[in-house]
Amino acid sequence: MTDAITLPSQYDPKQTEAKWQQLWESSGVFHADPNHPGKPYCIVIPPPNVTGSLHMGHAFEHALIDVLIRYHRMIGRNVLWLPGTDHASIAVSTILDQQLQAEGTNRFALGREAYLKRAWAWKESSGKTIVGQIRRLGLSVDWSRERFTMDEGLSRAVLTAFNRLYEAGLIYRGQYLVNWCPASQSAVSDLEVENREVQGHLWYLRYPLTDGSGYLEVATTRPETMLGDTAVAVHPEDDRYRHLIGKTLRLPLMNREIPIIGDPLVDPTFGTGCVKVTPAHDPNDFVMGQRHRLPMMNLMNKDGTLNENAGEFAGLDRFVARKQVVARLEAEGFLVRVEDYKHTVPYSDRGKVPIEPLLSTQWFVKIRPLADAALKALDRQHSPRFIPDRWAKVYRDWLVNLRDWCISRQLWWGHQIPAWYVVSETNGEVRDDTPFVVAMDETAARAKAIAQFGEDIELQQDQDVLDTWFSSGLWPFSTLGWPDDTPDYRRYYPNTTLVTGFDIIFFWVARMTMMGQYFTGKIPFRDVYIHGLVRDENNKKMSKSANNGIDPLILIEKYGTDALRYSLVKEVVGAGQDIRLAYNRKTDESATVEAARNFANKLWNASRFVLLNLEGQTPGQLGTPRRQDLTASDRWILSRYHTAIQTTRERIESYGLGEAAKGLYEFIWGDFCDWYIELVKPRLQGENAKAKRTAQQVLATVLDGTLKLLHPFMPHITEEIWHTLHQVADNEVLAVQPYPKANRRAIDPDLEAQFSLLIETIRTIRNLRAEAGIKPGLYIAALIEASAEEAPIFEAGAADIQHLARLESLTIGSGLQIPQRVFSGVVGKSEVLIPLAGVVDLEALVSKLQKEGDRLRKEIQSLTARLNNPNFVNKAQPEVVAAAQAQLAAAQQQLAIIEHRLQSLGVDDKTQP
């Protein structure tokens, strides 16, 4: 007999995880080779922002991706998981600006060069933290291909994309109304605007007609903008005002004459049906202003204060100006009344202040041609495929309703716009009429400018940077070497799958599909797997603003990486569904993750048992069992094992990752650990060498395959156990072993059904013993009143039932003589009974059951009264009412069981035996 191969008595996640993360990386097992013969499977990581550290949403997303990546690597695909980070222009700028403010300065005082030096230092620090956290998660990425959205290769891709779009007439510079964030002093895209419902006011103002014949009343939620009014509009079909169209009004406070116009955009039911028109500060007014050729009077400075066009109110903050304008209007008799009014106000998602619609010269992408091409791919080729498919409609609707994309940001951190103004043509100033050239670099720009304006020129590069989503939109192909035709680009583009949250379908997914389709002629990924959000213990979305996030590293330190990863994946009940993570903020404990750690410990202990009983032999030395030597329990566990292989593969292939994780849990904990290992112990401890070896072969086969099945979900612990099981060198790892394939001939549904009946029988006897208070170590008698079709199954499994239910005798038959004082339970079409006389104190048992019956009757009475109370049913939250109804049903069921038990003991209600 060889000395047993064993594992330590306890699993140490910290030691094991650190060891394998280092070995995986140093051995290069995750390095992608374009020449690998397997079919490509590529995912580029949704790049985390370099804004500090990863949060639980990242851990969730990365755990899902790693399941897909490890699985496809093990089935022989040519796998690339490319890591990287995003420069996050607005987010990082906000952090740096806050730091500078705390130091009593700002970026303008610091200067662009020093500011960018500081930004790069932040990126290095934050990026290092994020990479360390990704490594801590044990993700199987190819670190040799790590990318950053502002590294040299990706910057060249951004410059190329901008130049090509500009040359095609799809990028232009124009004066339009943009969403302006006074806090960050930058334009923001429509998608970076958060619409909030607020309780505000509606001010009714009186505008006098210049001919002295009367006045019009207008209603507004922003009275300070009336200083920039250039018209009052009414609906052309509104009989109340149609006769006034073409007349003029005197603008209060400003004493300016403005026209009354008719426009179908006006809602006659809003306010008085007359609306003030401020084209430079409202999107609808801007449209009307263009249609009627109204002057565009900008009132705002970039910091949210009023400019010189506001007259005496110049220099005031917009909200201070609001109060003073209202006070003046009231003092001069122009304020009619004020009403409370709930309405929607757009806020900057980053700056957290109300957006100011501002007339500004910006750079735009002409989006319609790009969106139409993406729509064509979706409608004709169903590309990309969304999982779940309901998101395809959301994606489509958004593409249909897109407006031109403002891509310039008044920031310094990011890709500086590759446009150079020929300022020598406008006295050294950059003005709206200053000519410019677009080029890849200043040398090329100078050559273009000289060709147009001669040698004596002065150039100045545009100071703005591109919207972060511009470079992110190129991520699936720029990371692979585009615009060059590299081996990686040829082999791994289009990507296979994108895994991302639904909250950035608009920000990111659509940008990538439009950019990919335009520049490469292909949608950049085949599938888009949309996952939900991670919610906290109160079912609220985790976010920085709510201050309810959970640091993944806290739970990793406490429970281990595998436990966190597995718990997050297992919680997914369906593609796109949110998950809930139980967490105690006082103790940093999570029942959800603790359950996954317990599962890891269960696997570890079961593996220790198997290894000890293999007596130093590896699966290779033991060989495979011969079918004629297999017992029924061997054939059952092998059937369950191959069923698990089949269902796990099917679920992963169809993105049912949560279902796959749950299925493996049930097979490993239930079928293998709780049942087969217990069933096989007598043979391992017996004298029959042949039976023992067959049991060892089955144990080794199932454990080896189970570790492979579970590896994508819990990579570290499975790698450690597999390595110990096979006693192989460090460079031979589970991560690249073939994933098990189901042997359909080994799957026996009839045998599985028979064992389900036997297992349910054992479980029922155990429950009856517990209800009766029978000591666990006491061997008792049991009877099975068996149906004709089930009797042979019970007979064949009698030895297993007796062994696992601790029975000294088991009688199986039909029409049995049933003794008095029994507990019974139904199993299938049969009944299981255990006699209690001489086994328990019957008087004490009756007393215990009666007390429990009395308690349940009181509970039922209380719950019934509560649910019959209309005040409770009508006023309580629906989930509270549903919980009370469920509690009542459970209590009634428990009482029925108690009463049945008392009758079995010969007790009618509360009478003694």
Swiss-Prot record:
One of its GO terms (molecular function) is ATP binding. Keywords: Aminoacyl-tRNA synthetase, ATP-binding, Coiled coil, Cytoplasm, Ligase, Nucleotide-binding, Protein biosynthesis. It is found in: Cytoplasm. ATP binds at residue 544. InterPro entries: aa-tRNA-synth_I_CS, aa-tRNA-synth_Ia, Anticodon_Ia_Val, M/V/L/I-tRNA-synth_anticd-bd, Rossmann-like_a/b/a_fold, tRNA-bd_arm, tRNAsynth_Ia_anticodon-bd, Val-tRNA_synth_C_sf. Catalyzes the attachment of valine to tRNA(Val). As ValRS can inadvertently accommodate and process structurally similar amino acids such as threonine, to avoid such errors, it has a 'posttransfer' editing activity that hydrolyzes mischarged Thr-tRNA(Val) in a tRNA-dependent manner. This is Valine--tRNA ligase. The gene is valS.
